[in-house]
């Protein structure tokens, strides 16, 4: 319901205005003061010896940051660089922090997105509630670049390159601060970053167009690959920042979806609640992010759909050149 207030001008927004407006003003004041304290030197920030690239946004919710992180890691790896990824590890509870992921780390330890990134890229991935601690651990691994998944507002960590990922269709909603609107920072922040990435929709001036390109569906148990359109009576579910984006992708792929179910982002699934969805169809299809949480109890009729970030070739080269210049 809160997203309907933020993005759809729902009438409840007007009813709740007297309650939410003061809270939004308080959020804005705290966020602005925190940023000012770090930038003025009143609070100490950490400067890494390794170039730090931040991929974040100015709104709450899922905008497509993780596919951008994966793309950056893979592109830099293809040029021979060793890349590390730092994350807060939201949704996980590690035995200690900072925590360096291994091939067998599960989402309940590190959170779902770090596991996805580790499995996709084989990069060094570290998590810690204080991101600078994760960065310090990655420095010890001898990485050439560190990419932070989210953390644009984590001013305790200095950075060399900043990306803001924008949902090209929902944009910035009603342009109010949390909780009345989706903003973590004001839209004026857009003018101070290195790259604005527009995920879907029509990119505005100075924005780089990005598309999420789906590949074949992959079976969670067997690893078999099949076109989505060849799967029948699908039940689709997603526990991501904006589930309708996933359902729309399936529709564009002409998937035979008979039921959809959205869950909150980073949800820790119980086997029974996913198994219950099977009553609506013959097979399940989910996002790659959800698949890492369902892998341990998956059934042979469960599939996931990976997506890859794609950019115009010229823009992709500009992005990589600017990052590599920092290293040189």
UniProtKB/Swiss-Prot annotation:
It comes from Aliivibrio fischeri (strain MJ11). Its EC number is 2.7.1.130. Belongs to the LpxK family. It catalyses: a lipid A disaccharide + ATP = a lipid IVA + ADP + H(+). Transfers the gamma-phosphate of ATP to the 4'-position of a tetraacyldisaccharide 1-phosphate intermediate (termed DS-1-P) to form tetraacyldisaccharide 1,4'-bis-phosphate (lipid IVA). The keyword Transferase applies. InterPro entries: LpxK, P-loop_NTPase. GO terms for biological process: lipid A biosynthetic process; lipopolysaccharide core region biosynthetic process. Pathway: Glycolipid biosynthesis; lipid IV(A) biosynthesis; lipid IV(A) from (3R)-3-hydroxytetradecanoyl-[acyl-carrier-protein] and UDP-N-acetyl-alpha-D-glucosamine: step 6/6. One of its GO terms (cellular component) is plasma membrane. Keywords: ATP-binding, Kinase, Lipid A biosynthesis, Lipid biosynthesis, Lipid metabolism, Nucleotide-binding, Transferase. GO terms for molecular function: ATP binding; tetraacyldisaccharide 4'-kinase activity. This is Tetraacyldisaccharide 4'-kinase. NCBIfam families: lpxK. ATP binds at residues 59-66.
């Amino acid at each position: 319901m809160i997203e309907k207030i933020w993005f759809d001008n729902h009438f409840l927004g007007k009813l709740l205005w007297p309650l939410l407006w003061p809270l939004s003003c308080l959020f804005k004041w705290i966020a602005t003061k925190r940023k000012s304290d770090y930038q003025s030197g009143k609070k100490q920030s950490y400067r890494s010896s390794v170039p730090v690239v931040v991929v974040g946004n100015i709104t709450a919710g899922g905008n497509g940051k993780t596919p951008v992180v994966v793309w950056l890691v893979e592109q830099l790896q293809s040029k021979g660089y060793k890349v590390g990824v730092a994350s807060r590890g939201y949704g996980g509870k590690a035995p200690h922090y900072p925590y360096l992921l291994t091939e067998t780390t599960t989402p309940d330890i590190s959170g779902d997105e770090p596991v996805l990134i580790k499995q996709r890229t084989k990069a060094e991935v570290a998590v810690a509630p204080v991101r600078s601690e994760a960065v310090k651990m990655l420095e010890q691994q001898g990485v050439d670049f560190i990419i932070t998944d989210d953390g644009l507002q984590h001013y305790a960590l200095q950075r060399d390159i900043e990306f803001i990922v924008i949902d090209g269709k929902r944009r910035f909603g009603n342009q109010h601060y949390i909780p009345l609107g989706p903003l973590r920072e004001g839209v004026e922040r857009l003018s101070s970053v290195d790259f604005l990435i527009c995920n879907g929709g029509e990119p505005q001036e100075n924005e780089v167009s990005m598309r999420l390109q789906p590949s074949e569906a992959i079976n969670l148990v067997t690893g078999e690959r099949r076109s989505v359109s060849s799967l029948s009576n699908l039940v689709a579910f997603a526990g991501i920042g904006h589930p309708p984006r996933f359902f729309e992708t399936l529709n564009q792929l002409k998937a035979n979806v008979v039921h959809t179910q959205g869950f909150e982002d980073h949800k820790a699934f119980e086997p029974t609640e996913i198994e219950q969805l099977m009553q609506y169809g013959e097979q399940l299809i989910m996002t790659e992010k959800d698949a890492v949480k369902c892998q341990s109890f998956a059934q042979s009729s469960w599939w996931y759909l990976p997506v890859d970030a794609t950019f115009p070739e010229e823009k992709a080269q500009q992005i990589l050149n600017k990052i590599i210049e920092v290293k040189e």
